[in-house]
C-alpha cells in the first residue's frame, strides 16, 4: 500500500484499531501523520486512542457479531489489533471470506491471543528453546504440573496481560493462593493456565523486530524491569554479548517469519551469558518499547505505521534502525478510584533531557498505568535515574 488518500473523503485510506489504549494512541498519531483515516474501537468510551482518532466505537470485541458489524460498517483497508481480547476467529474468517487485511495476519492475531498458541508454535513446531511448561485446566492438573516442572515456577492465565492473574510460586505455601488468583485475574475469567518452570536468567529483553517491504530489521535490545508481571522500567540499549544478540535475532526472525505479514513485533527473551530462551511475542508495539519515543529516530509506533503501510522504515538494504543514545522509561502508576489529575508537571520536566507522556486514561479503578517518563543520558544508569527522578516529581491525584 504505497498510495495514500485523504481522510474523510472517498479516497481515504482507512485503518481500524481494535484496542485503543496508550500504545494504540501512539500508533494512531503516527498514522495521522500520513493522512490515514483512523477509526478506534475498544470496550470502553474515551479510551486514549479514541481521543486522537477520526471516530470511535465502543463494543465487546470478543462478540463475533458485534465485531463483524463494525467491520462491515467501516470497511477498513487495514485492521490493526492492538490488544489480545478480540474474537480472532472472526478475523480469520473475514480474511478467508473477503480478503480482509489484518495486521500482521489473522493467523498471527489468533495464535498470539493467548499463551498456549504461541508457546506451542515456538517450542513444538519451531523447536525454539523455552522454559519447561505445562497447560492445565483444573486444580488437580495444576498440582501435577508443579510437581513436574518443580519450584520455583510461575503460573499465568493463558489469556491475560500486564501481570493480571500471574504469580511466582517459591514454596508449597504459595500454591493455593496462586491458583485462586489465576482463576480470577485472566481476561476470560476462570480457565486454562500455563505453569512455567523457572529459568535462571541474567536479564530479559524485548527485541523489537520489524517485518517490512524491504525485509526484516531489528531495533537495539531493550532491557526491562517488571514487578508483579507488569512493566515498570525499560531502557535501550541493553548490553549483551555479540553471541547472545545474534542468537536473539535468530530466534526473533524464526518466530516472526512463521507469523508472517508486515508490522512490528515485540519478541520477549530470557538471556543468561550467551544462552537465549524464547518467552513470548506480541504482533504489535510493546509496552517496554515506550522508551523508543526518545531512544530511536523512529519510535516503535512510527516503525509499525510505516511497515503496515508498505513504506520504508529507514533500514532497507542492510541498514539499521537508528538510535539516539542511552535512554530509559519509567511507568507512572495510579492506585485507587477516580479520574487522574497530575501535579508538579513542570518539575518533572525540569531536566532538558526528559520527556513525559500522559496517556489520557479516563479513569482508574484499582491500579492502572497512566503515563510514562522518558530520559536520555550518557549512560543507561544515568538515563534510568533521570526517568525515575522525573516520575518521583509527579503527584497523581484521583478525583471523582
Curated annotation (Swiss-Prot):
Record's keyword terms, sorted: ATP-binding, Ligase, Magnesium, Metal-binding, Nucleotide-binding, Purine biosynthesis
Keyword Heme carried by entry: no
List of residues binding ATP: 115, 156, 161-166, 196-199, 204
EC numbers: 6.3.1.21
Gene Ontology MF terms: ATP binding; magnesium ion binding; phosphoribosylglycinamide formyltransferase 2 activity; phosphoribosylglycinamide formyltransferase activity
InterPro entries in UniProt: ATP-grasp, ATP-grasp_carboxylate-amine, ATP_grasp_subdomain_1, PreATP-grasp_dom_sf, PurT, PurT/PurK_preATP-grasp, PurT_C, Rudment_hybrid_motif
SUPFAM superfamilies for this protein: Glutathione synthetase ATP-binding domain-like (SSF56059), PreATP-grasp domain (SSF52440), Rudiment single hybrid motif (SSF51246)
Transmembrane segments: none
GO CC terms: cytosol
Gene3D superfamilies per record: 3.40.50.20, ATP-grasp fold, A domain (3.30.1490.20), ATP-grasp fold, B domain (3.30.470.20)
Matching HAMAP family: PurT
Function: Involved in the de novo purine biosynthesis. Catalyzes the transfer of formate to 5-phospho-ribosyl-glycinamide (GAR), producing 5-phospho-ribosyl-N-formylglycinamide (FGAR). Formate is provided by PurU via hydrolysis of 10-formyl-tetrahydrofolate.
Protein name: Formate-dependent phosphoribosylglycinamide formyltransferase
Organism classification: Bacteria, Pseudomonadati, Pseudomonadota, Gammaproteobacteria, Lysobacterales
Amino acid at each position: 500500500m504505497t498510495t495514500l488518500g485523504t481522510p474523510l473523503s472517498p479516497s481515504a485510506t482507512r485503518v481500524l484499531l481494535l484496542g485503543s489504549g496508550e500504545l494504540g494512541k501512539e500508533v494512531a498519531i503516527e498514522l495521522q501523520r500520513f493522512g490515514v483515516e483512523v477509526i478506534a474501537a475498544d470496550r470502553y468510551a474515551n479510551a486514549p486512542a479514541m481521543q486522537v482518532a477520526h471516530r470511535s466505537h465502543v463494543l465487546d470485541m470478543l462478540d463475533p457479531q458485534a465485531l463483524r458489524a463494525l467491520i462491515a460498517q467501516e470497511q477498513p483497508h487495514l485492521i490493526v489489533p492492538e490488544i489480545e481480547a478480540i474474537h480472532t476467529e472472526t478475523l480469520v474468517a473475514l480474511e478467508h471470506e473477503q480478503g480482509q487485511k489484518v495486521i500482521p495476519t489473522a493467523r498471527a492475531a489468533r495464535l498470539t491471543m493467548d499463551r498456549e498458541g504461541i508457546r506451542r508454535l515456538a517450542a513444538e513446531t519451531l523447536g525454539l528453546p523455552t522454559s519447561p511448561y505445562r497447560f492445565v485446566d483444573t486444580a488437580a492438573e495444576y498440582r501435577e504440573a508443579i510437581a513436574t516442572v518443580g519450584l520455583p515456577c510461575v503460573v499465568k492465565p493463558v489469556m491475560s496481560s500486564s501481570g493480571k492473574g500471574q504469580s511466582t510460586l517459591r514454596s508449597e505455601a504459595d500454591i493455593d493462593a496462586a491458583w485462586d488468583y489465576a482463576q480470577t485475574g485472566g481476561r476470560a475469567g476462570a480457565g486454562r493456565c500455563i505453569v512455567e518452570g523457572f529459568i535462571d536468567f541474567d536479564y530479559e529483553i524485548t527485541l523489537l523486530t520489524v517485518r517490512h517491504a524491504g525485509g526484516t530489521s531489528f531495533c537495539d535490545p531493550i532491557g526491562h524491569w517488571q514487578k508483579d508481571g507488569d512493566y515498570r522500567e525499560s531502557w535501550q540499549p541493553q548490553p549483551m554479548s555479540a553471541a547472545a544478540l545474534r542468537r536473539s535475532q535468530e530466534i526473533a526472525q524464526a518466530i516472526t517469519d512463521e507469523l508472517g505479514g508486515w508490522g512490528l513485533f515485540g519478541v520477549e527473551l530470557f538471556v543468561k551469558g550467551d544462552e537465549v530462551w524464547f518467552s513470548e511475542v506480541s504482533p504489535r508495539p510493546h509496552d517496554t518499547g515506550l522508551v523508543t519515543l526518545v531512544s530511536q529516530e523512529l519510535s516503535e509506533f512510527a516503525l509499525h505505521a510505516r511497515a503496515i503501510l508498505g513504506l520504508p522504515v529507514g533500514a532497507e538494504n542492510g541498514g539499521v534502525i537508528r538510535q539516539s543514545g542511552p535512554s530509559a522509561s519509567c511507568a507512572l502508576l495510579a492506585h485507587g478510584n477516580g479520574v487522574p489529575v497530575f501535579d508538579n508537571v513542570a518539575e518533572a520536566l525540569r531536566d532538558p533531557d526528559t520527556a513525559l507522556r500522559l496517556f489520557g486514561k479516563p479513569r482508574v479503578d484499582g491500579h492502572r498505568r497512566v503515563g510514562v517518563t522518558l530520559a536520555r543520558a550518557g549512560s543507561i544508569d544515568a538515563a534510568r535515574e533521570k526517568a525515575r527522578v522525573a516520575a518521583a516529581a509527579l503527584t497523581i491525584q484521583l478525583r471523582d
